Amino acid sequence: MTVSIYLAKGRDKALRRRHPWIFSRGIDRIDGKAELGETVEIYANNGEWLARGAFSPQSQIRARVWTFDKNEAIDKDFFVRKLNQAQALRDVLAERDGLTGYRLIAAESDGLPGITIDRYQDYFVCQLLSAGAEATKDLLVEALVECYPDCNIYERSDVSVRKKEGLKQRTGVLHGEEPPESVVIEENGVKISVDIVNGHKTGFYLDQRDSRERACKYVKDKSVLNCFSYTGGFGLYALKGGAKHVINADVSQLALDTAKYNAEINKFDLSKAEFLNADVFKLLREYRDNGTKFDVVIMDPPKFAESKNQLTGACRGYKDINMLAMQILNPGGTLLTYSCSGLMDAGLFQKIVADAALDAHRTVQFIERFEQAADHPLDSAYPEGFYLKGFACRVV
């Protein structure tokens, strides 16, 4: 028997605007008992059919919409269509930017709620973040194999958000071969080694590709401090852009070793690069206290806010770190600063940077805005898909 969800009166407006989430508080009743991730029918309170989605009994997001087409079944062909639609956009980007690594599926923004797929050469790395994504995993793998016959599929569902969906963390091969320690991709003429099994996220921060390329114009003949460098993404582009000297700072020696390897495979001048194992907050204070200055500081920290109750603390963290960055910049220097916290909108982040300038006793001019790369699209009905924001700031 098909399970049916009936929304409370007046709670169908977002769904009619094609927002893909149904919250528990918006449900009037459920007819039938749905299993974790089961496909259910969704109706307005008056019985009008609205959508078909995946049920998640433990999450505040009680259902995520697969389709608004009553005649569309959630089967292998459904996933094949979604993959082909997504690939059409990425083909344009891959040709334009010379990409062999990109985000193929950006979850809700590509019509597949809770499913993220990053492609590194012929390795497809899946993160399944919702009950529906987990329940349809076999169909997804079948669809990937049909669309990409030579693919290798690896799961990196080792993220804490799965607990909210009643799911355990999982990693491992879903199809084909285990990824090697290093898969080298290329973007904008830069080679990057990716560790799919042990790296952050699915191995690399693909969403910052456009920002990395745009950073090049600020660094020629400049001294650059690349904070939270991970495997050196921004630092590599700084060397590409003609920086005089680049310090890559991170707490992970493994990431720094990979950053150095990345510089080597790009044949950059290693005499212009440093790879410093350090706590960035402590390092910035040391530089401030001993008078060390830079022409450019790149500030790309990890997410500071995972939930709303962490937002206040995150604001303090972002303000402190940007204040310290401004204090070690030469007059007229450039701060490239970013936030990947989806709970913090661009307006709030800009205010935080402005407040940091006041505390640093510096004047800041916002001269450029950044956002996530084009393979992380924003669906018009799903504003939550916008999460990465950044600014180029002239600090005087």
Swiss-Prot record:
Under the heading InterPro entries, the entry gives: PUA, PUA-like_sf, PUA_sf, RLMI, RlmI-like_PUA, SAM-dep_methyl-trfase, SAM-dependent_MTases_sf
Alphabetical list of Pfam families matching this protein: Methyltrans_SAM, PUA_3
Catalytic reactions of this protein: cytidine(1962) in 23S rRNA + S-adenosyl-L-methionine = 5-methylcytidine(1962) in 23S rRNA + S-adenosyl-L-homocysteine + H(+)
Q: Where is the PUA domain?
A: 2-81
GO CC terms: cytoplasm
Q: Does the UniProt entry include the keyword Transferase?
A: yes
Q: Which domain of life is it from?
A: Bacteria
Q: Does the record bear Glycosyltransferase in its keywords?
A: no
* Record-given protein name: Ribosomal RNA large subunit methyltransferase I
Q: Tell me what gene encodes this.
A: rlmI
